From Swiss-Prot:
Predominant place of localization: cytoplasm
Subcellular location: Cytoplasm
Protein's organism: Histophilus somni (strain 2336)
Catalytic activity reported: L-glutamate 5-semialdehyde + phosphate + NADP(+) = L-glutamyl 5-phosphate + NADPH + H(+)
Name this polypeptide is given: Gamma-glutamyl phosphate reductase
Short name of any one Pfam family annotated for the protein: Aldedh
Any GO BP annotation: L-proline biosynthetic process
Function per UniProt: Catalyzes the NADPH-dependent reduction of L-glutamate 5-phosphate into L-glutamate 5-semialdehyde and phosphate. The product spontaneously undergoes cyclization to form 1-pyrroline-5-carboxylate.
Keywords, comma-separated and alphabetical: Amino-acid biosynthesis, Cytoplasm, NADP, Oxidoreductase, Proline biosynthesis
Gene name of the record: proA
Pathway membership, UniProt: Amino-acid biosynthesis; L-proline biosynthesis; L-glutamate 5-semialdehyde from L-glutamate: step 2/2
Amino acid sequence: MSLKEMGKNAKQAATILAQLSQQQKNTALQIIAEQLELQSDKILVENAKDIQLAKENGLSDAIIDRLLLTKERINSIAKDVRHIISLSDPIGQIIDGGILESGTKLERVRVPLGVIGVIYEARPNVTVDVATLCLKTSNAVILRGGKETNYSNKILVKVIQDALEQTGLPKNAVQAITDPDRNFVLELLKLDKYVDMIIPRGGAGLHEFCKQNSTIPVIIGGVGVCHVFVEESAEQDKALAVIDNAKTQRPSTCNTLETLLVQESIATEFLPKLVAHLKHKNVKYHADPTALSILEKQNAEVSIVQEQQLRQEWGSLDLNVVIVKDIQQAIAHITEYGTQHSEAILTSSPRLAHQFVSLVDAAAVYVNASTRFTDGGQFGLGAEVAVSTQKLHARGPMGLEALTTYKWVCSGDYTVRQ
């Protein structure tokens, strides 16, 4: 099937989905969850093929772990689907409205976007997460996963499509591009006749490629060069716990701390405490000259930070450390090197906290809390399809409402404008 045909089929499926009740959609999602569990053995057989190829191609242990499915992980994915069932359906919600002077009733009603294209890398769980979020919001979806997950994605999409057919819903509501040729990504990005939004989930290179080549609106995000600024009035022991959590809990995530900013006045006191606190966490430091001289005395594994490393999403236990004179210099650094994802200040000053929140341009700004909270589940949104760092349409974790738009509905009594 050509990509154009896939787009046409998705558009037709979206028209049907837009007419479904919440109960119809939840029934389909329930069957998807059940079938994931019932067919877990088949899924694991296909996933094993991806794992074998990954090992043969020398992929890192971290990537292989993201690729790996187990019975427990499949059960967890099914549990996530059931959680989506429990969420309120935003479609059809009346956002606001009123009665106009003419007597016309005006309502702003939440509706699906239509067809969403999602391009992502080596995470088979994303296949199910995205498909079910789109179904819950009456959107059709065209998936293009990384070549590393090709076997896993094929079987997962088949399970979903079979479940849709069992409930009388169009299987083309969820489709996948399984050819690894990158030209298909480029073709998808030009399919504006059928696709209403593109959501890339991956590194900076993928986001930039989509932004440069798409004729469809693209949600940019997911790349997190996140900062924590330790201001001189911060409670240092509590600050150490926040930094530890933000850096070491899950280093590969986009909400992980990458650059630590420390106020100059407390650097000689605070940095030795930091090294002692993280000594068993295998953190590698990349420091500016002032921080380097302090960290070397603590026998830390440290090197001089390079300018390009300040723009790097490490995705590992590497940590940049930069000394700043004051909050103005901290904000200036974040403005220059941040990716508008998640930024934090640790301080006892309400005035400086307010200044930081007001002036730092990011999807999520934290006062005395870890950047790791930037997550749909943590924000009470249920699941998320991505984290947007742009300002138009959606910003931050994208839950169900972010997969919708709205239309104005006017109801009159054969009313004409005077």
